């Protein structure tokens, strides 16, 4: 990024997770709108960012279609499975198959030390409807609506929310 002229500001607040980096990026964007552009690589945050990321990541499902046609003679799998934290990998994997009922979609989330342990990032299983980073989605939160810190050994799966696309698919029992 630096080679392309970007100024990189490491996040030193909180636990230095995706949530903390997103907090700082949005804060800087709001405080310096004249020279700051907000771009994120995960399907979280306010519209249109989750949709933009999903569309850009859709090259994954395009490649799946192409390779399946090449090797199997059909362009759809029986199942698609992808991990979800913020959800960019999953969004790209399922993008061109969301409306194809022949394809079963499985979203895997970080269970941590077990969903009943209090040390988990299983937002689909444990989250409640809430707002995080300008997006209405499933969020790990307490009874007062305060966001809880998720637990995962994976840096990409420790987000306390989930992309709204994935929350909707879970709500509709599509994933």
Model-derived features: where do they sit?
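Buried hydrophobic positions in well-ordered alpha/beta secondary-structure cores of metabolic enzymes
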Residues: 1, 64, 80-82, 87, ...
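A glycine-rich helix N-cap at a beta->alpha junction
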Residues: 1-21
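Alpha-helix C-terminal capping segments
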Residues: 2-3, 94-101
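Active-site nucleophile and cofactor-binding loops and adjacent substrate-binding regions
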Residues: 14, 57, 80-86, 109
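Active-site/ligand-binding loops adjacent to catalytic centers
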Residues: 19-54, 74, 99-102, 107-175
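Helix-loop module immediately N-terminal to the HCX5R catalytic loop
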Residues: 51-67
């Amino acid at each position: 990024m630096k080679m392309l002229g970007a100024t990189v500001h490491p996040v030193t607040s909180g636990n230095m997770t995706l949530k903390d980096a997103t907090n700082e990026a949005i804060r800087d964007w709001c405080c310096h709108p004249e020279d700051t552009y907000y771009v994120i690589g995960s399907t979280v945050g306010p519209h249109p960012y989750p949709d933009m990321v999903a569309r850009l990541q859709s090259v994954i499902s395009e490649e799946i279609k192409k390779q399946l046609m090449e090797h199997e003679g059909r362009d759809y799998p029986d199942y698609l499975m992808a991990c979800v934290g913020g959800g960019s990998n999953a969004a790209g994997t399922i993008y061109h198959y969301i409306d194809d009922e022949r394809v079963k979609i499985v979203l895997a989330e970080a269970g941590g030390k077990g969903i009943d342990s209090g040390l988990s990032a299983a937002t689909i299983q444990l989250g409640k409807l809430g707002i995080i980073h300008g997006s209405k989605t499933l969020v790990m939160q307490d009874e007062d609506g305060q966001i809880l810190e998720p637990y995962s050994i994976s840096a990409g799966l420790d987000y306390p929310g989930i992309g709204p696309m994935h929350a909707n698919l879970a709500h509709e029992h599509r994933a």
